[in-house]
């Protein structure tokens, strides 16, 4: 069983969030510490701690998340210019151990990011 995180509490509506999208499999909400004019987190409702914990059973869910990220970006007006970020592990910046995709846009980004 995955650790109970702030994201699982958002899914259960135990704490508030500015939700911008929801379906049976995932939820998207505005980041409380945005790093761009548009910064939304897209999370699966299934409590996967990180991408490396996914199994072949999660194939459809992972595809769903990518397609929904594209749709959420379009709904937020950044559909043709956005960045997706997944941090997998504490050493690379993951602070909440519930898989989440950062959808960022609304300003230019540089490469490399870190």
Swiss-Prot record:
Disulfide bonds: none annotated. InterPro entries: Histidine_triad_CS (IPR019808), Histidine_triad_HIT (IPR001310), HIT-like (IPR011146), HIT-like_sf (IPR036265). GO terms for cellular component: cytoplasm. Pfam families: HIT. Residues 6-114 form the HIT domain. Gene3D superfamilies: HIT-like (3.30.428.10). GO terms for molecular function: hydrolase activity. This is Uncharacterized HIT-like protein slr1234. PANTHER family: HISTIDINE TRIAD HIT PROTEIN. SUPFAM superfamilies: HIT-like. PROSITE patterns: HIT_1, HIT_2. It comes from Synechocystis sp. (strain ATCC 27184 / PCC 6803 / Kazusa). A motif (Histidine triad motif) lies at residues 98-102. It comes from the Bacteria.
């Amino acid at each position: 069983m995955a650790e109970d995180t702030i994201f699982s509490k958002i899914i259960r509506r135990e704490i508030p969030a500015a939700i911008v999208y929801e379906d049976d499999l995932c939820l998207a909400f505005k980041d409380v510490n945005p790093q761009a004019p548009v910064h939304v987190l897209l999370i699966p409702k299934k409590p996967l701690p990180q991408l490396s914990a996914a199994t072949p059973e999660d194939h459809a869910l992972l595809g769903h998340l990518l397609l929904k990220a594209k749709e959420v970006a379009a709904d937020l007006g950044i559909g043709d210019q956005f960045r997706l970020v997944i941090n997998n592990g504490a050493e690379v910046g993951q602070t909440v151990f519930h898989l989440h995709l950062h959808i960022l846009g609304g300003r230019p980004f540089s490469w490399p990011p870190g």
